[in-house]
Amino acid sequence: MPSIRLADLAQQLDAELHGDGDIVITGVASMQSAQTGHITFMVNPKYREHLGLCQASAVVMTQDDLPFAKSAALVVKNPYLTYARMAQILDTTPQPAQNIAPSAVIDATAKLGNNVSIGANAVIESGVELGDNVIIGAGCFVGKNSKIGAGSRLWANVTIYHEIQIGQNCLIQSGTVVGADGFGYANDRGNWVKIPQIGRVIIGDRVEIGACTTIDRGALDDTIIGNGVIIDNQCQIAHNVVIGDNTAVAGGVIMAGSLKIGRYCMIGGASVINGHMEICDKVTVTGMGMVMRPITEPGVYSSGIPLQPNKVWRKTAALVMNIDDMSKRLKSLERKVNQQD
């Protein structure tokens, strides 16, 4: 279990310490579950009333909240961001031994950097290059001539097809498949003719991809995931999609082929986005958005009808279904009124 003096933690976080710097911090916890040795954080003033009951040894908070502190405190401008950084310092995620499991199958032509770890039953094919400190989990498959940059980690049972490039310090969770064939077919009088998918997938640095997500290889050009992109679980990224730097994609999103998304976008969960179009930088699509046309202006976009009681929803749906007829009737009435005038 990691541990650190509160004063040392404050220094690493560039936080202002109030209280005993010799307190030993052993973990991060919520305000409700924290015990002695834990540090917690407060991001909303409405939780001030809970500070008296909180048993944490220290709390991360803003200057405005400091008068309400009942324990040692670290004062920062952004408690939530500080929480993320101190959670990294006190991370308890298991780290594998820096070795290669006897059951791993590694082609003789593969190039392995220093301190590479390869888990049981993993397969590394010919021409693969693994950078320094790469971790390949048990049961992973890395196809021919693929490259994985230094410090990247594949959790168990990740599949990386041939000719894929993954940058440095990336994290890919279990069950994800990168580089499978895109959905490319031509129709010959009712019969589907497969189009070989000869593009690649290029993933930048510091990319994180959740569990059971699929990123298809390009048909001709490459599918590209920019630097700093984060993609949640169970997303489908079709062939030739380009996602710009530092864009965030929540769970269950489906992106059709040849879509281009700009930088610093946020795509809400379960959204569906049409292909062969562009979304500009700094666009937010709220959850379950259906994006059928290009977006050319930054901003927040939504679609669909939010949850309603069923009886109300049925009436709303009926109104929507009849809106064209009602519009025609209204225009007809307007013409009659104008004629009377």
From Swiss-Prot:
Explain the regulation of its activity: Inhibited by divalent cations such as Ca(2+) and Mg(2+).
Cited PROSITE patterns: HEXAPEP_TRANSFERASES (PS00101)
The organism's place on the tree of life at top rank: Bacteria
Reactions listed under catalytic activity = a UDP-3-O-[(3R)-3-hydroxyacyl]-alpha-D-glucosamine + a (3R)-hydroxyacyl-[ACP] = a UDP-2-N,3-O-bis[(3R)-3-hydroxyacyl]-alpha-D-glucosamine + holo-[ACP] + H(+); UDP-3-O-[(3R)-3-hydroxytetradecanoyl]-alpha-D-glucosamine + (3R)-hydroxytetradecanoyl-[ACP] = UDP-2-N,3-O-bis[(3R)-3-hydroxytetradecanoyl]-alpha-D-glucosamine + holo-[ACP] + H(+)
Q: Which Pfam family, just one, is annotated for this protein?
A: LpxD
The annotated consequence of residue 276 to A reads: 30-fold reduction in catalytic activity
Q: Which GO terms describe its molecular function?
A: identical protein binding; N-acyltransferase activity; UDP-3-O-(R-3-hydroxymyristoyl)-glucosamine N-acyltransferase activity
Outcome recorded upon mutating residue 239 to A? 1000-fold reduction in catalytic activity with very little effect on substrate affinity
Enzyme class at the top of the EC tree = transferase
This protein's UniProt keywords: Acyltransferase, Antibiotic resistance, Lipid A biosynthesis, Lipid biosynthesis, Lipid metabolism, Repeat, Transferase
Q: What does this protein do?
A: Catalyzes the N-acylation of UDP-3-O-(hydroxytetradecanoyl)glucosamine using 3-hydroxytetradecanoyl-ACP as the acyl donor. Is involved in the biosynthesis of lipid A, a phosphorylated glycolipid that anchors the lipopolysaccharide to the outer membrane of the cell. Prefers (3R)-3-hydroxytetradecanoyl-ACP over (3R)-3-hydroxyhexadecanoyl-ACP as the acyl donor in vitro, which is consistent with the structure of E.coli lipid A that contains over 95% (R)-3-hydroxytetradecanoate at the 2 and 2' positions.
* Family in the record: Belongs to the transferase hexapeptide repeat family. LpxD subfamily.
Q: What protein name applies here? A: UDP-3-O-(3-hydroxymyristoyl)glucosamine N-acyltransferase
